[in-house]
């Protein structure tokens, strides 16, 4: 066994016990191992003793002798241990007794200093372990005395502070979590500086720390108020909202903490062992420590808002892709309340944005004006461009190009089918240099369609003349309709012939 430093030192009763065990009359004396003479002890060192002292007294049940004093930070001594015999003697000794259980490094184990644990057990808390170690699973209460541990319980030590900010009360009401590992936590906790400040204040008020036991994969947590009485209380996690300080249950008198994930004590005390055997503890799906999203009370959702085009125009939604829609007849009361609220804020909320122009002005005008920033008002994002009107002085747009003398607007309108290329929503504006290869059209070019108002008026005049002729001849109603439809077909055929001829197409 290699020499290894151990913190702390043994008291004088231990020195006498080691001397008695290693004496020739002791129970660990062996014929094949020569014992060394007693070593003189220095002030900061242990004496050298045999590994047989760490061996089992009974081969069927290995026993590890417990250190009576707690190992503290002030213990700076070291102990050295080595075999008195050679390698062959050590092999014979290990052959007689079963193997000693593998011991973890002392840096991975920490002992509690207060209160003093029983002589047969040592309590370990997960928060005292280094950060690279996973939280230890600890026994509670009677489980420690029985020597059994439960794999579903994790110990979380916390400190106590007053809920109302007072410093004179002796009854702790709030708990602040300390040293919770980030990879094991499922909720957010305050910063380390806040924890240090809270722990300093809490240690002055109460010397007995509170221990919270969280069931892995569960929403309930158990709290030990006093380490001597081991009282257990059921705790429930409550999500954090803006009004969390006022969020209290009626059957719960006092909150346990004001952190994210509020702990609220139940009115009854639970027996952990009995409930675990009976399976009374609830389980949580996916291992979350908070309730599911469907059960969390949240703020009311806004189901009717101005960004709905149907609602803004004063219509009901019909064949829309909206989810949880309330803009229908089934939610008439909610819709009426939303309309009343919108009109209370803005009396002109439901008026059309594109209104009629002034007297003598043929083109309509935007009532409020657009508010474009990066589109240049040459896309359907702009309400003025979508309505095929130019921006006016009431618009609040930046970098506007939708005005009469704009070269970009003229280039865009000179393109064939410009509404399909530059007017569609989401289309990209192309600068004039991109259209250098496109054919230029003269200003006196023919319109894209030959159906003008003059053509429509001429067609209607032909239909009226045919109707008057049928009336003069006293034709029946069916015959008069037939004559009018034949005249309409003749007019339409003439219009199409003219259209094809203008484009150089032949009509079969």
Swiss-Prot record:
The keyword Phosphoprotein is annotated on this UniProt entry: no
Localization in the cell: Cytoplasm; Nucleus
UniProt entry tagged with the keyword Cytoplasm: yes
CRC domain ranges (all copies): 292-405
Record's keyword terms, sorted: Acetylation, Cytoplasm, Developmental protein, Differentiation, Meiosis, Nucleus, Spermatogenesis
SMART domains in the record: CXC (SM01114)
PANTHER family in alphabetical order: TESMIN, TESMIN/TSO1-RELATED
Protein name: Tesmin
Organism this protein belongs to: Homo sapiens
């Amino acid at each position: 066994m290699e020499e290894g430093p151990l913190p702390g030192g043994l008291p004088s009763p231990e020195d006498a016990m080691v001397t008695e065990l290693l004496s020739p009359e002791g129970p660990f004396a062996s014929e094949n191992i020569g014992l060394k003479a007693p070593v003189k002890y220095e002030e900061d060192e242990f004496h050298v003793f045999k590994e047989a002292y760490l061996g089992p007294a009974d081969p069927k049940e290995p026993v590890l002798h417990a250190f009576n004093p707690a190992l503290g930070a002030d213990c700076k001594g070291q102990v050295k241990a080595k075999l008195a015999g050679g390698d062959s003697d050590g092999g014979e000794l290990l052959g007689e007794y079963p193997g000693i259980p593998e011991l973890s490094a002392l840096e991975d184990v920490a002992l509690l200093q207060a209160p003093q644990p029983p002589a047969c057990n040592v309590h370990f808390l997960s928060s005292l372990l280094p950060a690279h170690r996973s939280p230890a699973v600890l026994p509670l209460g009677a489980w420690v005395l029985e020597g059994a541990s439960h794999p579903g319980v994790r110990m979380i030590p916390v400190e106590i502070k007053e809920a109302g900010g007072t410093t004179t009360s002796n009854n702790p009401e709030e708990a602040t979590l300390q040293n919770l590992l980030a990879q094991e936590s499922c909720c957010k906790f305050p910063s380390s500086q806040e924890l240090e400040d809270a722990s300093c204040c809490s240690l002055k008020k109460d010397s007995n720390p509170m221990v919270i036991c969280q069931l892995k994969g569960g929403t309930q947590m158990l709290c030990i108020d006093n380490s001597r009485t081991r009282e257990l209380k059921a705790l429930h996690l409550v999500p954090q909202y803006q009004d969390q300080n006022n969020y209290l249950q009626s059957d719960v008198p006092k909150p346990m903490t004001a952190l994210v994930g509020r702990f609220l004590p139940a009115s009854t005390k639970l027996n952990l062992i009995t409930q675990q055997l009976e399976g009374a503890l609830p389980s949580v799906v996916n291992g979350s420590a908070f309730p599911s999203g469907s059960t969390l009370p949240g703020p009311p959702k806004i189901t009717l808002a101005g960004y709905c085009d149907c609602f803004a125009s004063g219509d009901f939604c019909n064949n829309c892709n909206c989810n949880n829609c309330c803009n229908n007849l089934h939610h008439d009361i909610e819709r009426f309340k939303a309309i009343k609220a919108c009109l209370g804020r803005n009396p002109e909320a439901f008026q059309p944005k594109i209104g009629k122009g002034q007297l003598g002005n043929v083109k309509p005008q935007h009532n409020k004006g657009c508010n474009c920033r990066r589109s240049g008002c040459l896309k359907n994002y702009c309400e003025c461009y979508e309505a095929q009107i130019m921006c006016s002085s009431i618009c609040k747009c930046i970098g506007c190009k939708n005005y009469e003398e704009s070269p970009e607007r003229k280039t865009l309108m000179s393109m064939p089918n410009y509404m399909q290329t530059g007017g569609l929503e989401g289309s990209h504006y192309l600068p004039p240099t991109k259209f250098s290869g496109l054919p230029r059209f003269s200003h006196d070019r023919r319109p894209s369609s030959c159906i003008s108002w003059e053509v429509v008026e001429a067609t209607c005049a032909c239909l009226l003349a045919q109707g008057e002729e049928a009336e003069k001849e006293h034709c029946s109603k069916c015959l008069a309709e037939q004559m009018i439809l034949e005249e309409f077909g003749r007019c339409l055929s003439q219009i199409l012939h003219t259209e094809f001829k203008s484009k150089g197409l032949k009509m079969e």
